[in-house]
Amino acid sequence: MIRLQKFGEIVGTSRSWKLLSSTIAKRYSSSSNGVKEMTVRDALNSAMEEEMKRDDRVFLIGEEVAQYNGAYKISRGLLDKFGPKRVIDTPITEMGFTGLATGAAFAGLRPICEFMTFNFSMQAIDHIVNSAARTLYMSGGIQACPIVFRGPNGPAAAVAAQHSQHFAPWYGSIPGLKVVSPYSAEDARGLLKAAIRDPNPVVVLENEILYGKTFPISKEALSEDFVLPFGLAKVERPGKDITIVGESISVVTALEAADKLKADYGVEAEVINLRSIRPLDINTIAASVKKTNRIVTVDQAYSQHGIGSEIAAQIMESDAFDYLDAPVERVSMADVPMPYSHPVEAASVPNADVVVAAAKKCLYIK
């Protein structure tokens, strides 16, 4: 599993920076077959750099984003390129710097507000929800708030209950916010660039375990003009027997499960990468369900009021319901605060075997 690989590369320490420095010396590399590749970390970094060059109203603000190059080195080199007025270190006060960033957006700038982890965004949720998300509506469309809130989200590795929460259901329920959750380097680059250019607040939920993962990247995605539209999911693996839907690192779990289903049962699973939480691309999901007649959702949030619950409800309310041959199955985080113990933590987070079991239930395989 990705979450167990090269742990030293994903923690925000000076030691991890030494481990990483040799692998991110350039934006992308070419594999042995000539396919260009890029890490999610470099995709996010290049997206911010290009948008800061493109628009001098864009600036980055947050804890350790400047002199330390970011806790996870996402902002590596930006201070040297743009200076301390556009790459701004802050004290440890999420309420303070989020309020500053939101006010700057109201004044016409385009802040990128980084949370070291989205768990800390709880300290600033009033600014995000009551100020950034609602002011356009409450001002009768007069006062926009072009701001990006970004940082790592969801379970990581042995960081316990207060640092492992998944915020897609939280922010995905708020009118006035757009919420995206990238899986691949191409997702991260295209969605972040689109978020920075958007005239309204966008929440970008990243995953720290994916930061160091390398993905193939197309020539189109390397263009400075590349953006991905919100509300458009991607079929990562075509299939005909069952639909598996995930977002961010849950796509990894879904793809692993699809491989197991193929190898063990000859089942061809279609895997959908949501990319966008709000707006949600229910049309792509429904089209897949009409083909496969079965669906399993996978995410690392809690099942109650979660992403899978929303997908299940919308499928039930759509004409895709008539195509279902089995109830929707949800695979999600165990309904407990995240344990610190690694073995218990691993048992709390969805894995491929759990997804396979859910798929077998849908397919009536004993």
From Swiss-Prot:
Thiamine diphosphate binds at E94. Its EC number is 1.2.4.1. Keywords: Metal-binding, Mitochondrion, Oxidoreductase, Potassium, Pyruvate, Thiamine pyrophosphate, Transit peptide. Tetramer of 2 alpha and 2 beta subunits. This is Pyruvate dehydrogenase E1 component subunit beta, mitochondrial. The gene is pdb1. The pyruvate dehydrogenase complex catalyzes the overall conversion of pyruvate to acetyl-CoA and CO(2). It contains multiple copies of three enzymatic components: pyruvate dehydrogenase (E1), dihydrolipoamide acetyltransferase (E2) and lipoamide dehydrogenase (E3). It comes from Schizosaccharomyces pombe (strain 972 / ATCC 24843). Its cofactor is thiamine diphosphate. InterPro entries: PDHB_mito-type (IPR027110), THDP-binding (IPR029061), Transketo_C/PFOR_II (IPR009014), Transketolase-like_Pyr-bd (IPR005475), Transketolase_C (IPR033248).
